[in-house]
């Protein structure tokens, strides 16, 4: 009996458990590491003298803006508003600018510019930016009897540049602005080849052809334009001083914010716990900074930066590491949105899921006192929808399935993140700035959001599809379009560019009165589109963040502007 119950002391034979083969994305390490932690330990305070000077300069500029507009002063005020906006300080003067441009609308209606191409174009752009649906028919007067733009305009470089910038405000069926874009691009390219003697103007031409004002990030444009404006002999010295001062004051705030986020990220120990993913905390903060740089959005920026950083880890888990079975488990846990679901996850997924739940719980608690914690539920649902789309793509990849292009878009526009990001960007904004109905608007995929997802997705697919296919990835839009239509890669890109151009027109249309939601909310979506346009302009600058992206971040978060 005893021998029958005895247990052998020899260890049981080991099971031959084979580690799953995982793709190797081989992302480079963080460019910034702990660089910004120094701003947490030694925060720079704004001294009373600087603060006083800032207020004095602001008041001087305000007085210049509130003077009544007349025909004689119209050009001066238009130039002042344009400079204020491009220097990144318009947020101080929203009310005054709105009043001035309302008066400028009357001058527009009275057709006071005659044959001045520069002024006509400038007024058109500023009024369109303000949401006024002014007619582009005004540019007909610059055409000859053959219906072409007058050749004499080719000598007016400043006017051509102004017209070029105005064409980027076009909406659908504005053929004259399409013609103007083609005309001005051709002429301005000739200006570059001819080596214009006015080097400051030449610099602006090169800059504009690379990234027009409508598509530029406010903060980066400010950094660039300060260097241009100070070389302008007719510049407003008060405005120049104020812009430099304001830039540096805001930079100190932004440095402290990214320091806070770096400390949070360091405590998560991402580089060790999630070594397969892109370590891009500072780049994610830069993304949030693109959405809103103004001081009143500090809470929103930090929330948005954390959300984007976590979503980036989840994205890489689906694209670059997780097995089909593991991703199904994570999707189920996310859809349940229950911390207890963590027990079903592989060990490496648990820190990400835990922090995702904790982050949204913390946001909800922070907003509770303001009576706006309801916002977090909208944000959660947008994240769940995106993760579900990630999993749909994982199923396609697992089954070696290449969908039709339209079928692909139904999922890929959600997985782009640009349906989720606008909703989440609203969450941390002030109580009175985002009415409840704005969350219903943004979460129902309105035209503005739909257009932004098209731009984000197609820009991504154009520049990233070859690298993604090399490492093993679901078919991108390029492959789907090529297969369905028997097209070449070049033909697919041409079609994508057409759709991106059309989406920009949708965005411009949505920013004209009557507005679906307040302009400052539309600007959040617009800024996200501007960021993604920059993001993919020279390849994938997020994945490969050690070149252009590093330079952009350094110019805004490291290098101050000499006064």
Swiss-Prot record:
Record's cofactor remark: Binds 3 Mg(2+) ions per subunit.
GO molecular function: germacrene C synthase activity; germacrene-D synthase activity; magnesium ion binding
Source organism superkingdom: Eukaryota
Any coiled-coil regions, as ranges: none
Region annotation (Disordered) ranges: 1-22
Signal peptide: none
Residues binding Mg(2+) 3: 468
Catalysis performed (reactions): (2E,6E)-farnesyl diphosphate = germacrene C + diphosphate; (2E,6E)-farnesyl diphosphate = (-)-germacrene D + diphosphate
Co-factor(s): Mg(2+)
Keywords linked to the UniProt accession: Lyase, Magnesium, Metal-binding
Protein name: Germacrene C/D synthase
Organism: Valeriana officinalis
């Amino acid at each position: 009996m005893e021998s029958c119950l005895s247990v052998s002391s020899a260890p049981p034979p080991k099971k031959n458990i084979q580690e799953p083969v995982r793709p190797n994305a081989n992302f480079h390490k963080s460019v910034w590491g702990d660089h910004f932690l120094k701003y947490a330990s030694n925060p720079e305070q704004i001294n009373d003298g600087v603060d006083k000077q800032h207020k004095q300069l602001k008041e001087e500029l305000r007085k210049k803006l509130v003077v009544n507009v007349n025909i004689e002063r119209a050009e001066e005020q238009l130039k002042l508003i344009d400079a204020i906006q491009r220097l990144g300080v318009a947020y101080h003067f929203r009310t005054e600018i709105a009043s001035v441009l309302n008066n400028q609308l009357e001058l527009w209606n009275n057709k006071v510019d005659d044959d001045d191409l520069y002024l006509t174009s400038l007024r058109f752009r500023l009024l369109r930016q303000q949401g006024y649906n002014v007619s582009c028919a005004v540019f007909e007067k610059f055409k000859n009897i053959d219906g072409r733009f007058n050749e004499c305009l080719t000598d007016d470089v400043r006017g051509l540049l102004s017209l070029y910038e105005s064409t980027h405000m076009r909406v659908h069926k504005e053929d004259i602005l399409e013609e103007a874009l083609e005309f001005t691009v051709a002429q301005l390219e000739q200006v570059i080849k001819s080596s214009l003697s006015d080097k400051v103007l030449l610099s602006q031409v090169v800059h504009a052809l690379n990234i027009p004002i409508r598509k530029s990030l406010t903060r980066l444009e400010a950094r660039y334009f300060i260097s241009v404006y100070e070389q302008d002999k007719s510049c407003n010295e008060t405005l120049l001083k104020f812009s430099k001062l304001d830039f540096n004051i805001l930079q100190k705030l932004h440095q402290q914010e990214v320091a806070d986020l770096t400390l949070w990220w360091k405590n998560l120990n991402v580089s060790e716990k999630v070594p397969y993913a892109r370590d891009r905390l500072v780049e994610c903060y830069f993304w949030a900074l693109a959405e809103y740089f103004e001081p009143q959005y500090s809470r929103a920026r930090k929330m948005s930066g954390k959300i984007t950083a976590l979503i980036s880890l989840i994205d890489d888990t689906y694209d670059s590491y997780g097995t089909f079975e593991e991703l199904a488990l994570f999707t189920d846990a996310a859809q349940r949105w229950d911390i207890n679901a963590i027990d079903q996850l592989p060990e490496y997924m648990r820190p990400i899921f835990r922090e995702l739940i904790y982050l949204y719980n913390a946001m909800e608690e922070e907003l509770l006192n303001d009576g706006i914690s309801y916002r977090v539920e909208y944000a959660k649902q947008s994240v769940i929808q995106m993760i579900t789309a990630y999993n749909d793509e994982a199923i396609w990849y697992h089954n070696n399935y290449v969908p039709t292009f339209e079928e692909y878009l139904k999922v890929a526009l959600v997985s782009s993140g640009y349906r989720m990001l606008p909703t989440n960007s609203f969450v941390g904004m002030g109580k009175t700035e985002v009415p409840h109905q704005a969350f219903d608007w943004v979460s129902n995929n309105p035209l503005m959001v739909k257009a932004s997802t098209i731009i984000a997705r197609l820009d991504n697919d154009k520049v990233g599809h070859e690298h993604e296919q090399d490492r093993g990835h679901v078919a991108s839009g390029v492959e789907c379009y090529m297969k369905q239509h028997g097209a070449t890669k070049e033909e697919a890109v041409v079609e994508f560019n057409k759709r991106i151009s059309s989406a920009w027109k949708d965005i411009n249309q949505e920013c004209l009165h009557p507005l679906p939601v307040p302009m400052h909310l539309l600007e959040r979506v617009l800024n996200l589109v501007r960021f993604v346009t920059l993001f993919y302009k020279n390849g994938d600058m997020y994945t490969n963040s050690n070149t252009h992206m590093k330079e952009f971040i350094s110019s805004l978060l490291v290098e101050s502007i000499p006064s």
